[in-house]
Design a protein with these regions (language model features):
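Non-catalytic accessory regions of SAM-dependent methyltransferases
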Residues: 7-131
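Short hydrophobic-aromatic micro-motifs
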Residues: 51, 60, 134-137, 199, ...
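Rossmann-like S-adenosyl-L-methionine
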Residues: 191-342
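A short, sequence-level motif marking secondary-structure junctions
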Residues: 63-68, 141, 211-214
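A short interface-forming secondary-structure element
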Residues: 131-143
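Non-catalytic substrate-recognition/targeting regions of SAM-dependent transferases
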Residues: 115-122, 126-128, 144-218, 227
């Protein structure tokens, strides 16, 4: 059994400045570096640390990291972050998805976000489920270092349903933390050798490649927006700019759009759009794939060509220094799009 008292002796402590504990008492998931009075011990990036008020009251435990967000809180109740903790937290996340109808066996959706960072009280962690394959991305050093425990917990809670756990953190984990950022499988069921598979979302089929695709392979967080497009697409000519693998395009076709044009500068993405149109069984004459710069295409089209337009550009700002320019670019893009909708 784990010697908890011994573990507490060696765990680093974060002591907050006077009156800086209020946000934690309201269950805010972060401790900012400016709130810290003292660090007792010498924690490495990703270590679990305990957080105390200036009066010595235990407040939380979480992952330590150098930067403006010094601690990402894992628990407000205990500083024991062990295998049982990971199993309990991931089980709770799955129970929420079952309760909301996302994780129902035999339904018309078999892909969903299992863990959405702070929303599931697991800051720094994303896990997406693709019909038996869990793809995880760590956005903090602590979550990256805990990836084996996380994978083991997923094996326990999903059992035979789990085909694989794939870690795709090389583009999301903090590179300054000196981590070994190589993507790869943390678990594979015997006989499973695929890097892609067809999944269902609201009855629509999509081919997802988690090793080569953006993010975890598919933008699951856009599900409700895709359903929104479905409401308006019938009998309309639709343009999907920055289409990636064509999620919005497939929903528009399924809703009865007259014609859909999908535009993206990535040839790989456009090949997947064509594949998704094919596996969806749609008439190919109703869809055109255009491997072009979306902004250039938008400039050249007549103002009455489309009745419905989806504009979902990539992030223009990766850091605060370019935020103002990015906001201006979004404004120009949206204004141009609005001017071209009939």
């Amino acid at each position: 059994t784990e010697d908890i008292s011994e573990k507490r002796k060696i765990m680093a402590k974060i002591i907050l400045k006077k009156s800086r504990e209020d946000s934690l008492k309201r269950f805010h998931p972060w401790v900012f570096s400016g709130a810290i009075a003292q660090i007792v011990g010498n924690p490495a990036e990703g270590d679990v640390v305990s957080v105390y008020s200036s009066e010595g009251e235990f407040l939380a435990a979480g992952h330590y990291q150098i930067g403006s967000i010094a601690v990402r809180v894992l628990s407000f109740e205990t500083d024991v972050i062990n295998d049982a903790y990971w199993e309990a937290m991931l089980s709770k996340a799955l129970e929420v998805r079952i309760a909301t109808g996302l994780a129902q066996d035999g339904g018309n959706t078999n892909c969903y976000r299992l863990v959405h960072g702070e929303g599931d009280n697991l800051p720094g962690l994303i896990i997406d489920w693709y019909d038996g394959v869990c793809v995880m991305q760590a956005h903090s050093a602590g979550m990256f270092r805990a990836k084996k425990q996380i994978a083991d917990a997923l094996v326990k809670i999903y059992g035979d349903k789990l085909k694989a756990v794939y870690d795709k953190s090389s583009g999301t984990a903090p590179f300054k933390a000196g981590l070994d950022l190589i993507d790869g499988y943390l678990y594979k069921k015997e006989g499973f050798n695929d890097n892609e598979q067809v999944v269902l979302e609201n009855g629509h089929k999509f081919l997802v490649n988690w090793t080569e695709g953006q993010k975890t392979g598919f933008f699951l967080d856009q599900r409700e927006n895709r359903k929104l497009v479905e409401r308006y697409a019938k009998d309309r000519n639709v343009l999907n700019l920055f289409c990636y693998t064509g999620g919005f395009s497939i929903y528009a076709l399924g809703a009865g759009a007259v014609h859909v044009d999908s535009v993206d500068s990535s040839a790989k993405a456009m090949a997947l759009v064509d594949k998704n149109v094919e596996i969806g069984g749609f008439d190919k004459s109703r869809h055109t794939s255009l491997c072009l710069d979306a902004i250039d295409y938008l400039k050249d089209i007549p103002a009455d060509k489309y009745d419905l337009m989806i504009v979902d550009p990539p992030a223009f700002a990766k850091h605060r220094g370019v935020l103002r320019n990015a906001l201006r670019a979004y404004q120009r893009l949206n204004a141009a799009a609005i001017s071209k909708v009939a």
